[in-house]
Amino acid sequence: MRKGTGIMKTPKPLLALRMVFPLAASLIVLLLGEGIARGSLSADVFASFIFPHIGAYLLAWLLLFLVWLLLDWVFRCPPLSTLGMAVLGCAPCAVNFYTLQLRGEPFLPWDLTQVSEAAGVASAAGLKIQPSMVVAIIVVLVLMAGSFFLYRGRHKQRWLPRLAGSAATAAALCLLVFGVYLQPAVTQVLGITPDAWMQDRYYRYYGVITGFMTNLTNLEISKPEEYSQEAVDALLDNVDESQKFATSPLYSTSYSAVTPKDEQVKQPTIIYVMDESYWDVSELEQYGITFDTDVSKNLHALQQTSAYGRAYSPSFGGGTCDVEFEALTGYSVSFLPSGSKPYQQHVTKPMFAMPNYLKLKGYQTAAVHCFWAKYWSRDKAYPNLGFDDFISLEDMHGVTKVRKHYWTSGLVTDDSMADQIIQQYESMKSSSDKPIFLHAVTMQNHTNYNKDNYPDDERVKVLSHPAGLKPSTVGALEDFATGIRDADAMLGKLTEYFSQVDEPVILVFWGDHYNPIDSNYDVYTTTGYASDSSADPRLHQTTLLMWSNYNQQQVDLGTIAAYDISPVMMDIYGLEEPLYFQFLNRQLRVASRTNTRGTTMNLDGTTTQEPTEFQQRWSAEHWLLQYDLMFGRGYALQRMGLAGLSGVDTGK
């Protein structure tokens, strides 16, 4: 007892434990959270992810420690401080685990604007609590109980020291958030490198807390310095002038090149199908892998009488909506902050897009997607892009679902999606004489892959493969190849149906992105197909087909950017292009095949990370027009007859 005070002096061992507890508890919570996010924590996780990027985890540890300290200064209730810190450390990790399951992307800051929608989707999807979450709850309860007994009898603090302690801790927290987390120059010094390709990998490397906090920098858009009405008008004047002297379409064998203009179809039905994770996996047969069936027989047959090539995707392993956004608009996500999601953050008002433009030309429009309407905010983004109707999973009845080993509720098959597309087409045809634009997005072949997703008698089998592939990887490849076989059957079903309708139809079919198979790159590296880098250009060129029931010209498209899918389709079929699409086709003709996420593909198909000044100028002009149409005053809209879509200037 201190002399004259009546206060018992705290024993040194107890004092030491009280000082160590918040540091230890915050470290334990950090590890619990990472275990939740990853499903488990193994020695390999520490060796491959945590230790090589230790700076990111030290920042997260410091953040949790300061949160505990601030709560303790304010409430002087250690169990409450422990609970608050644990919720902050573990809840985002649990959300991250489920968002990865549902959409292949981690928990991002802008998801906070959709809490109620996400809760509804999670409930409908039948998500289950994981063992790692149960362990975390038990450990947190033990920590809370421990803090109660450890700090019991601690003398009360007067209000002035508490106020000073609270202020100092809050200041330290602000310094950490605004002076470190939100300063890319500082985080890069700590070894935290932005990853434009794959947010999932970014979170695996740097952890959920640091990944989430650093993504807060991706909320604002910077206006191009040269942006003005004069600059936009001058650029569009140049496009207009160039078109007057254009001597030929992009491709010499295309329908528009070989068919007299007065004989060309003016308003065909246009159907887009973006197939989940689709690329022609039979290409691996050139690299030592053989399958027990021809997984792409319809594709290969149709390539003889269609326009075919590759779409350069901005995504790998996830980010389906990024690819969809590019294809529907001609906008490049490369100009947007790394990790941002256009549908959630930017498509918040009507804007120029293929559906809105076609509506101006008299089309009726609809979208079909066999997942929940609210995910990726499609229910809000689609109307702003110009879709009159949206048929989502909630509206589908009697559809077949597969792959229930990983996806508890199953995924709608591509065959059922073909039926949905045909039904929607027939419904639109019967209700209106207007031409149709119908856009569909599938789900059957979504990651993750496991041989148990299909019965043995339904799954494509790998007959031979290079040495070094693990059995689990071979099984995952069989799962993936089965999805490709079924996507090919869907393609055959659709082209067979639309070849018999009595009106002109264009069908554009492409894959959104590649994925890791069995959570690794072994299929690509062991065969020599590609490297183990998600930035490898080979892993961004998905299969693309443009077919019509009124033209049999074979056209080799080569590789084009996903944002060029709509402009190129309109060019090869001789459809009236908006000025913005004319600009994109001009860029494709003279500058580059794509400029995506730091990779430029030259006109000859070679790639570089160092574009020429000429290519950089075209890219800058692309961003100028995109900024005007997405965020600016919409000066270009007047020139395209879409002045009604013009909104107020916004940079956020």
Predicted regions and their residues:
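Transmembrane and membrane-interface helices of multi-pass
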Residues: 2-203
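Intrinsic-disorder-associated interaction segments
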Residues: 9-13, 202-205, 228, 473, ...
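Generic structural signal of hydrophobic/aromatic residues within well-ordered alpha-helices
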Residues: 32, 118, 209-212, 232, ...
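Intrinsic-disorder/low-complexity, polar/charged segments
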Residues: 40-45, 77, 228, 319-320, ...
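Short alpha-helical interface patches
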Residues: 103, 112-120, 133-135, 211-221, ...
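Alpha-helix initiation and N-capping motif
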Residues: 112-115, 205-209, 229, 296, ...
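Membrane-interface segments at or immediately adjacent to transmembrane helices
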Residues: 179-272
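Solvent-exposed soluble domains appended to multi-pass membrane proteins
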Residues: 246, 250-266, 272-275, 279-652
